[in-house]
UniProtKB/Swiss-Prot annotation:
Species per Swiss-Prot/TrEMBL record: Equus caballus
Protein name listed in UniProt: Sperm protamine P1
Subcellular location: Nucleus; Chromosome
Family: Belongs to the protamine P1 family.
Entry keyword set: Chromosome, Developmental protein, Differentiation, Disulfide bond, DNA condensation, DNA-binding, Nucleosome core, Nucleus, Spermatogenesis
Pfam families in the cross-refs: Protamine_P1
UniProt key word DNA-binding: yes
GO BP term, example: chromosome condensation
Disulphides: C7-C15, C38-C46
Amino acid sequence: MARYRCCRSQSQSRCRRRRRRRCRRRRRRSVRQRRVCCRRYTVLRCRRRR
């Protein structure tokens, strides 16, 4: 749910530039890293949603 919301909030150009491989690795690190993960994970949702 958080990934989807992040994707909608982020821009498509920004979503395309982010990566989702590092997000998976830094997923259970800290609450602050969770936001970064959402921004990087957004790439996968933005690309498949559009």
